[in-house]
Amino acid sequence: MDKLLERFLNYVSLDTQSKAGVRQVPSTEGQWKLLHLLKEQLEEMGLINVTLSEKGTLMATLPANVPGDIPAIGFISHVDTSPDCSGKNVNPQIVENYRGGDIALGIGDEVLSPVMFPVLHQLLGQTLITTDGKTLLGADDKAGIAEIMTALAVLQQKKIPHGDIRVAFTPDEEVGKGAKHFDVDAFDARWAYTVDGGGVGELEFENFNAASVNIKIVGNNVHPGTAKGVMVNALSLAARIHAEVPADESPEMTEGYEGFYHLASMKGTVERADMHYIIRDFDRKQFEARKRKMMEIAKKVGKGLHPDCYIELVIEDSYYNMREKVVEHPHILDIAQQAMRDCDIEPELKPIRGGTDGAQLSFMGLPCPNLFTGGYNYHGKHEFVTLEGMEKAVQVIVRIAELTAQRK
């Protein structure tokens, strides 16, 4: 599996951070560099129907090597890394045979500590690939890319029986645009798996229902000395709005299947304030109730304002829980779970407290649960991945292809 590590280190050397608020897709030039590199590598491996769309979706096919009516399946990862932490000049550290305790990240004060990240206790003896404390690592989702590419090579080299295997690498997943320009018909798979999860054994087919809430508050500013009965402080109204939002239903207070309201940004002056919330819930009814709650709060706080002052609230749904689509095709999960068990991995079905391209693709007609990559602590300088976890992911991808061929 030396090639697996080589691929991964090659991919993370490219800065592919996506950028929010940009109209073009992909949002950054660095993503194109990785997409063109992957296109070249897929062609060198002999895959067919290798295409790169003008919106940066790369697709290719490993043709079936056995006859029969075997369903075409897909594996998908994204090329961008999170805008939340620098992805420039990533300098990975390789820690072989981890023996426990803190891992120094580079030459500064940053450490990867089992006190803060207890999962490290479960990884003794493994090879960890970490950051140098200055950037993210990019395992999300370049570990997934390296695993898919390596699995393709294994299928070819070991001549493992399989049907048509479709692969796709998408841009701008981290800014919510990855699946918007995905041509499901062109992909032509019966179902697919995103390889974009976390620790070994994770199999995810439930994600949040998600919405964004943008609130515009228009007040009235006058000199504070003569403000009585005239000033309408937009910042005070913003504070009142947030005070009405349930404090125990925030991200830092919730876990598992619990939903939340999250104030992501707030800025303004006396004259004008803007607030941006995200709403998340696994249950569709509770999700709708949360949206109604925000509307009720805005109405309550805005009651009795001068006509020139107002609160404007816009709610936009982002994505929905893919569970309702995936459970219609239980064999997709059955195959993935069997593949894991065949690789001596106990499947861990858990909800995604976030979103994934697979959620949007599932509602576009391509059922698409999420497989693990072996990575942890995404979107920050404490991100790391285990080489053993990546190797297990490759084994599971290969086994899924093999099991699917046996279903003909």
From Swiss-Prot:
Its EC number is 3.4.11.4. Its cofactor is Zn(2+). GO terms for molecular function: metallopeptidase activity; protein homodimerization activity; tripeptide aminopeptidase activity; zinc ion binding. It comes from the Bacteria. Pfam families: M20_dimer (PF07687), Peptidase_M20 (PF01546). GO terms for cellular component: cytosol. Keywords: Aminopeptidase, Cytoplasm, Hydrolase, Metal-binding, Metalloprotease, Protease, Zinc. The active site is at D80, E173. Zn(2+) 1 binds at H78, D140, D196. The keyword Lipid biosynthesis does not apply. Its main location: cytoplasm. InterPro entries: ArgE/DapE_CS, Bact_exopeptidase_dim_dom, Peptidase_M20, Peptidase_M20_dimer, Peptidase_M20B. Zn(2+) 2 binds at D140, E174, H379. It catalyses: Release of the N-terminal residue from a tripeptide. It is found in: Cytoplasm. Binds 2 Zn(2+) ions per subunit. It is an enzyme of class 3 (hydrolase). Gene3D superfamilies: 3.30.70.360, Zn peptidases (3.40.630.10). Belongs to the peptidase M20B family. Cleaves the N-terminal amino acid of tripeptides. Homodimer. This is Peptidase T. It comes from Escherichia coli (strain K12).
